[in-house]
Amino acid sequence: MDQKSDSAGKCPVAHTAPRGRSNRDWWPDQLDVQVLHRHSGLSDPLGNTFNYAEEFKKLDLDALKRDLRALMTDSQDWWPADFGHYGGLFIRMAWHSAGTYRITDGRGGAGQGQQRFAPLNSWPDNANLDKARRLLWPIKQKYGNRISWADLLILTGNVALESMGFKTFGFAGGRVDVWEPEELFWGPEGTWLGDERYSGERQLSEPLAAVQMGLIYVNPEGPNGNPDPVAAARDIRETFARMAMNDEETVALIAGGHTFGKTHGAGDPSFIGADPEGGAIEDQGLGWKSTFGTGVGKDAITGGPEVTWSQTPTRWSNHFFENLFNHEWELTKSPAGAYQWKAKNAEATIPDAYDPSRKHVPTRLTTDLSLRFDPAYEKISRRFLENPDEFADAFARAWFKLTHRDMGPKVRYLGPEVPAEDLIWQDVIPAVDHRLVDETDIAGLKAKIIASGLSVQELVSTAWASASTFRGSDKRGGANGARIRLAPQKDWEVNRPAQLARVLSVLEGIQRDFNAAQTDGKKISLADLIVLAGGAAVEKAAKAGGHDITVPFTPGRMDASEAQTDAASFAALEPRADGFRNYVSTTRQQFMKPEEALVDRAQLLTLTAPEMTVLVGGLRVLKAGEPKHGVFTSRPEALTNDFFVNLLDMGTQWSPIEGEEGVYEGRDRRTGAARWTGTRVDLIFGSHSQLRAFAEVYAQSDAREKFVKDFVAAWTKVMNADRFDLV
C-alpha cells in the first residue's frame, strides 16, 4: 500500500533524476531496436512536408556570404576574436563538424548538424565551439529555414578561408538538419579522453576513428600525452585513413588548417567549468566558463597547448612549412602545462592575438612536428614547402573532401558553387544518356528474365546484394552504378561470387539483346536490369504463394565504370555480417553479435523495425541467404509468411547445436524429430519481445496478404534507397 500511495498521481514519465531503472538497466544485453526509430517526424518541428532543397533554392547565397564575411571581424566582448578575426575559430568549427566522419560505417560527419547536440557539443575536443555557433545565431535567425545548421557550419568555414585570402574548391548545400542526438558508438570508455579502444600493439577498434574518447582525431600532445612526433604520426595516419584520407590529403589538411588562428592554453585547465550539457540552467547551453583572469581573449583556455603557427594568422601563407623546416625545435610546456614545442634560438616573429606590441617565438604541436619527422609525411611536406601553389590546391581539394565526404553523390549537391569536376571519392555515376524503357518494355524484359532459367533465389539474391550496400549514413552504395559487377564487390564472399558471375552473365545477355534491338535510342542499364530482375522474381514468388502483386520499378539507374570506382574505398562497404542473408564472415573479426549486426545494417539501410522484420521473413523463404539455416518453409521460393508461422510454432523446441556456434536446431517437442535449423538472427524474432510482437502480426492467419504487401514495400525502399533523383 505504501508503494502504491507514494506513486499515486505522479506522471509516469521520469523527467529528472533520480529515476527508476530502465529495461536496459535490468537487461543490459537486450537487443536495442530503438535505434531504428530515431529521427522520426515526431521530433521534427518543421513537419513532414518541409522540403529543404526547395527552401535552399530561395536562399540569397551571396547576401549570406556577405553577412558571414562581416561577422569575421565583428569581435564581441563576450568572446573576442583572436587577432581581430574569427576565421580560425570558424575553420575549427567546420572541421570538427565534418571530422567525426568514419569510412568504416559512414557514420559521423557534418551531414546532420550533430555538433549542436550531445555528446559532440560537449566533447573536450569541441571546447568553446559553442561560442562559434552562438556567434552564428543572429545570421541563422535572419535566414531561417533557407539554410540548415548543418550547411551553415560548413559554409562558414569556407567563408572564413575565403575572407583570409584562400581560394576554396567549392561548396555544396544539401545537408538536412536533424532534431535529436545520434546515439552512435563513439567508444567503450566511460570517461573523457579514455583510450580503452586499443588492444594488442595499439590496435584501434573498429569502426572508431579517433584515439581517445572525446577527440576528433589525435591527441595534439602526442599519444596519451607522450610528446613523440614519430609515434604521433602513426596515430595520425591511422585516424585520417579511417576518415578516408591518404597521406597527401592528411598533410595538406593539417598544414592548411594550422595556417590560421591559434590554440588556447592560457592557464591551468582546472579553471574551466562544466561543458554545455553539464552546465547550470542559467548558463543557457554555454559551457567551459573559465575563471582564469577574464576567462576570454588572452585568458582563454580551450585545451592545453598555447600555439600560434604563422606570422600572419589571418592570411593564407606558406608559413606553416617555412617555420617547420627553418627551425629546430625544443620541448616545452604551455601555461596550461601541456607539452608543445618552441623554436630554438629563434627571433620573436609571431604576433600576439591581443597585444600588437608583443611578439612570440614560433611554436608547434607535437602532431605538427610529425609532418617533418615521419619520413613519408616529410617528403610531402618538403614538396609543399617548395611548391606553394601545389599545396594550396591540395588543401582546397582535401578541405572540400573533408566537408563533403558524407554527402553522397553529386545529385544531392545544391547551389551555385558546386564544382564541375567529378572526383572519384564521390562514387561517380554517369548521367542518363538514353531514352528509358516504358511499361511495354518492362513487361517484355520481365518475361525474358523469368524464361532465362535463373531461379527466384538467384535473382532475388543478386538484386539484394546490389542494393543492400547502401548506407544512409554517408549515402554510399546501393544498386545505382551496378558496381556489384566490379571489384571488389563481385568477389565478396557474402555475394557468392560464382553464382553472382553466372547470374550477371545471363542478365548482361538479356541487356545486350534488348539494347541491340532498339532503333530509337532506348536502352536499359545493367543496374536497372538487376533491380527489375529481382522485382520480377518477387512477383513470381508472390504468385507461387497465392498473391498477384506488381513490384514498383522506376528506370533511370546507370552503370559506373572501373575508372569511376575507387576499389579500395568500396572495400569498406563489405559486410562482416548481414543478417538479412544469414551471413557471418568466418575470416574477419566480428565486433557485434549477429543480431546486433542485423539491426546495425537495418539502420544503415534506413529501415524501421517492422520493415526489417518483414524483409528477414521474406528473404528467408526466398532462400536469398545462407541456404542451410532459417528457411522455415516447405515451399521455398514462394513468398509466404511461413518463416513466422513456423518460428512461433510452440510444437518446436530449440537447442544449440554442439560445435556450431550461433546455430540452433528446432525439434518436434513431442517426438523429437528434427524440423529446422536456425541462427541467432532467426531466433531473435521469437526471443526478443518487441520483435516477437512484430513476428506475431505477420504469423497471423489474416496477415498473408499484408505480409506480401509489406515485404514488397520494404523491398522497393531498399532497391530505391540511392535514387536521390526520385526525391
Swiss-Prot record:
Alphabetized UniProt keyword annotations: Heme, Hydrogen peroxide, Iron, Metal-binding, Oxidoreductase, Peroxidase, Plasmid
Identification of the protein by name: Catalase-peroxidase
One annotated Gene Ontology cellular component of this protein: cytosol
General function of this protein: Bifunctional enzyme with both catalase and broad-spectrum peroxidase activity.
Cofactor binding remark: Binds 1 heme b (iron(II)-protoporphyrin IX) group per dimer.
Superkingdom field: Bacteria
Site (described: Transition state stabilizer): R92
Reactions that this protein is recorded to catalyse: H2O2 + AH2 = A + 2 H2O; 2 H2O2 = O2 + 2 H2O
Active site, renumbered: H96
Annotated gene: katG
Enzyme class, broadest EC rank: oxidoreductase
Placement of covalent cross-link Tryptophyl-tyrosyl-methioninium (Tyr-Met) (with W-95): Y217-M243
GO molecular function, one term: heme binding
EC numbers: 1.11.1.21
Disordered as annotated region, ranges: 1-24
PTM annotation, UniProt: Formation of the three residue Trp-Tyr-Met cross-link is important for the catalase, but not the peroxidase activity of the enzyme.
NCBIfam families attached to this UniProt entry: cat_per_HPI, PRK15061.1
Binding site for heme b: H258
